[in-house]
Amino acid sequence: MIPPVILASQSPRRRELLEKTGIPFSIIVRDTEELKEASMPPQELCLHNAAAKAEAVFREHPDSTVIGADTLVFLEGFPLGKPEDEEEARSMLRKLSGRTHHVCTAVAIRSPLGMKNLAVLTEVTFRELTEKDIRHYMELVDVMDKAGSYAFQEHGEMIISSVRGDTDNVIGLPVRDVMKCLNGLGYRA
């Protein structure tokens, strides 16, 4: 019998993306300490955080397949996580203005059927933003719970000029790659 799937994330965006697969799942989240070390390579940092989330839930539910994920925005190798306040959010958007950065989403899958890890990088380029553009964007979008202070799926056309790679990855879960891993463990949608 295929174990039940648990998404170890409270992100509504990850829930919506995983729902697209057709695989039934529940959501269980445990608090974990997220690293924000700028000295670690982006994929390694994201994988560490994703694994911590998956393993915290898997310890309590060892008969389930647990999916943990972590998304970070990196500008010139420096991580931009979720802002602490609105001024930090404005500062992040100013830094990203007119520049290309990377979004890394790492996924850790823990299951009695096996263990999988993956990290996907997507390149995102911002338009040149004025202070008025930044203010208007922040009025429309709750930037406080978003890595890099923006959401691709929420008025992204206002601030983003191009994306090279998986747009689902920018939103928070590289669905195609996750499905390949789940298929490898025997899951079918």
Swiss-Prot record:
GO biological-process terms attached to the record: nucleotide metabolic process
Any Gene Ontology CC annotation: cytoplasm
Main location: cytoplasm
Record flagged with keyword Coiled coil: no
InterPro entries attached to this UniProt entry: ITPase-like_fam, Maf-like
PANTHER family: BIFUNCTIONAL DTTP/UTP PYROPHOSPHATASE/METHYLTRANSFERASE PROTEIN-RELATED (PTHR43213), BIFUNCTIONAL DTTP_UTP PYROPHOSPHATASE_METHYLTRANSFERASE PROTEIN-RELATED (PTHR43213:SF5)
Classification via HAMAP family: Maf
UniProt protein name: dTTP/UTP pyrophosphatase
Species for this entry: Akkermansia muciniphila (strain ATCC BAA-835 / DSM 22959 / JCM 33894 / BCRC 81048 / CCUG 64013 / CIP 107961 / Muc)
